[in-house]
Curated annotation (Swiss-Prot):
Its main location: membrane. Coiled coil: none annotated. Disulfide bonds: none annotated. High-affinity urea-proton symporter involved in the active transport of urea across the plasma membrane into root cells. May play an important role in urea uptake by plant cells at low external urea concentrations. Belongs to the sodium:solute symporter (SSF) (TC 2.A.21) family. This is Urea-proton symporter DUR3. It comes from Arabidopsis thaliana (Mouse-ear cress).
Length: 704
């Protein structure tokens, strides 16, 4: 007869009176932290970052000389360096789902879950580096992806893809707030709807003040906090905690979890709780990459995340903001560092939840509560507070990126295109800020509606590819294929979306006999819908373009103009002409294509194939797996924290020197700068001579 409770270490989760009843859920409607802590985190951190980032932007304006024009607000001067771009990509791609859903799939499928989450969402960023270079080559003055669509394919196509891009921002924002509000509510008891409205508040404030540059600066600070928390949790699970503390303990417990001697009949098992062998895994083990559920999730993840990178204007805005020589390197580095966030974190907190035999229910897991449960079990209140802080950083950072993405679309693709084509820089800046405020309010309303409807983070994450995946290949063709035509782009994107949704719902009805949130959230219908959407969209566009090729030369995309020219003397926006040379950009494209494909093949094909012969991991193999997770997370954290500081050291020194310099001197220098700007604007030749002399000086400094 099976022992009850089955494990000594999880006795507290079982009630021995009148049998052996396991807790029906981990949280059970109770909270670990007070409501006051929840409000303090939401409002306190929000206010702090609003003030802090606004102060950093003011310091740059005051002591470095950056000018806050509409171009600067929406593009950050198009001169952001590799380290900060990589940090922004990591921060932008670290959603609530990255922290929460990755551990959910670890809880469901074992070691394959974190791997497929990380690899399935890294390759898109690596490959998007190609698009980032193509923007510099073919649309150097663009502000949004839809602006490029209109320049190439005209008004009808522009409207279609504007809808897809805005829909992507809505989907991503929904996931951020669903995950964030669920965790805040579970840990602190803050009202779910109040959390939905308050979380975006601080983001709106600092984005309003500083635009894209404030978003980038905040993203860096948020990224630092996320990576510090990541390293703490990884080392806690595998080195220092009393409950676990080593890969050997985690390994032994994961083996015991599926042992045949363990009874998983009522009342030990409850609907949806982890208990016994894993259906679809080799020998039911959590310690294997031979997992049908994990592989299907991996496919859904790959398809869905192509949509949320290629169709999210936020990534195009980051590419536009990057210095040409930094673009490809920033995206590659950002992708590789980001891999560690879901892989290392979920390999720790996700597998840790299983190794601790936590009574997490399916509903709790779907809402993203696996990581907070593990953090509480290992660290108590301090663990829940650290996890809450980490999640808040991820949600607000990615949320600010979505705000700027939507702001740019409303400003340049709606207001400047259809309402006021002759808009001045001041008018555009005003509309940008109104769009930030408006979408911030919409974010809160959207989260309330979805929570009322019972939509979970897990469901939304799997469904995103069905809704927006059909636009991926047409958008890629826009900059990569001269024959791609407008008719095929419209037909492919719209038809792919319709066919994807029909396939998704039909498969759910056929397999489960009903169409509801539960049946449509299963892997089978989700996989079918995702694949049909992305493949149909691409196939239709390709066929139409081969039948009637456009043979485009990108002349109209190169003619996109900036609203306000940057003034010479602004160091932050003087991009050397050398960086925009076609030959140099071609070399950069060849570099990112080569290394993007190498790392894509490595993490999607070679790594999983090499792990299959291990079948069920041995103790030594699991030690190796855990060490890779620890090392990747630690090294990635050091790089993403240190590199932006090294690259920006001159600016940091300028600000520090300026802060301790006599303010009268600074005012005189400001006056001199204004006079010089007026002179160069009045005499254009003077500006050309200045730029030539500046390039010569930089070359001499480099040679010296």
């Amino acid at each position: 007869m099976a022992t009850c409770p089955p494990f000594d270490f999880s006795t507290k989760y079982y009630d021995g009176d009148g049998g052996c009843q396991r807790q029906s859920s981990f949280f059970g409607g109770t909270t670990v932290l007070d409501q006051g802590v929840g409000y303090a985190v939401i409002l306190g951190f929000g206010a702090f970052f609003a003030v802090f980032t606004s102060f950093l932007v003011w310091l740059e304006k005051r002591y470095v000389g950056a000018r806050h024009t509409s171009e600067w607000f929406n593009t950050a001067g198009r001169n952001v360096k590799t380290g900060l771009i990589a940090s922004v990509i990591v921060s932008q791609w670290t959603w609530a789902a990255t922290i929460l859903q990755s551990s959910n799939v670890a809880w469901q499928y074992g070691v394959s879950g974190p791997f497929w989450y990380a690899s399935g969402a890294t390759i898109q960023v690596l490959l998007f580096g190609v698009m980032a270079i193509e923007i510099k080559r073919k649309a150097p003055n663009a502000h949004t992806v839809c602006e490029i669509v209109k320049a190439r394919w005209g008004t009808a196509t522009h409207i279609v893809f504007l809808v897809f891009c805005l829909a992507t921002n809505v989907v991503v924002t929904a996931m951020l707030l669903l995950g964030g509000s669920a965790v805040v509510n579970a840990l602190t008891g803050v009202n779910l709807y109040a959390a939905s409205f308050l979380i975006p508040l601080g983001v709106v404030v600092y984005t309003l003040a500083g635009g894209l540059k404030a978003t980038f600066l905040a993203s860096y600070v948020h990224s630092v906090i996320v990576h510090v928390a990541l390293v703490v949790f990884v080392f806690l699970v595998y080195t220092s905690s009393k409950e676990l503390g080593s890969p050997s303990v985690v390994y032994d417990r994961l083996k015991d979890m599926v042992a045949k001697s363990r009874s998983c009949t009522e009342p030990l098992s409850h609907h949806g709780q982890a208990c016994g062998p894993v259906d679809g895994n080799f020998r039911g083990s959590y310690l294997t990459m031979l997992s049908s559920g994990g592989a299907v999730f991996g496919l859904i993840n790959i398809v869905g995340n192509f949509g949320t990178v290629f169709v999210d204007n936020g990534y195009w805005v980051s590419a536009i903001a990057a210095r040409p020589s930094s673009t490809h390197k920033g995206y590659l580095l950002g992708g590789l560092v980001w891999f560690a966030v879901p892989f290392s974190l979920a390999t720790s907190l996700g597998l840790g939840a299983l190794a601790l035999d936590l009574p997490i229910s399916k509903d709790e897991a779907d809402r993203g509560l696996v990581p907070p449960a593990t953090a509480i079990a290992l660290m108590g209140k301090s663990g829940s507070l650290l996890l809450l802080t980490m999640l808040f950083m991820a949600v607000t950072s990615a949320g600010s990126s979505e705000l700027i993405a939507v702001s740019s679309l409303f400003t340049y693709d709606i207001y400047r295109t259809y309402i006021n084509p002759r808009a001045t820089g001041r008018q555009i800046l005003k509309i940008s800020r109104c769009a930030v405020l408006g979408f911030g309010c919409f974010m809160g309303i959207l989260a309330v509606v979805l929570n009322k409807a019972g939509v979970s983070l897990g469901w939304m994450y799997l469904a995103m590819g069905v809704l927006i995946g059909s636009a991926v290949i047409p958008i890629a063709f826009m900059l990569l294929w001269s024959k791609a035509n407008a008719f095929g782009a419209i037909l492919g994107a719209t038809s792919g979306c319709v066919f994807g949704i029909i396939t998704w719902l039909t498969t759910a009805k056929t397999q489960y006999g009903r169409v509801d949130l539960d049946s449509t959230g299963k892997n089978g219908p989700m996989l079918a819908g995702n694949l049909v959407a992305i493949l149909t969209g691409g196939l239709i566009h390709a066929v139409c373009s081969l039948v009637r090729p456009q043979n485009y030369d990108w002349s109209t995309t190169r003619e996109i103009k900036v609203v306000e020219a940057y003034a010479s003397g602004d160091e932050d926006v003087d991009v050397p002409a050398e960086e925009l040379r076609e030959e140099k950009l071609r070399r950069a494209k060849a570099w990112i294509v080569k290394w993007g494909l190498v790392f894509t093949i490595l993490i999607v094909v070679i790594w999983p194939v090499l792990s299959l012969p291990a079948r069920v991991f041995s103790r030594g193999y699991f030690w190796f797996w855990a060490i890779v997770a620890i090392a990747w997370g630690t090294i990635g954290s050091i790089v993403i924290i240190g590199l932006p500081l090294v690259e920006s050291w001159d600016t940091i020194k300028s600000v520090c020197m300026g802060m301790f310099t006599n303010d009268r001197v600074m005012k005189k220098l400001d006056d001199l700068n204004h006079r010089l700007r007026a002179l160069t604007m009045a005499v254009p030749e003077a500006e050309k001579i200045y730029l030539l002399e500046l390039e010569k000086t930089k070359k001499n400094d480099e040679e010296g």
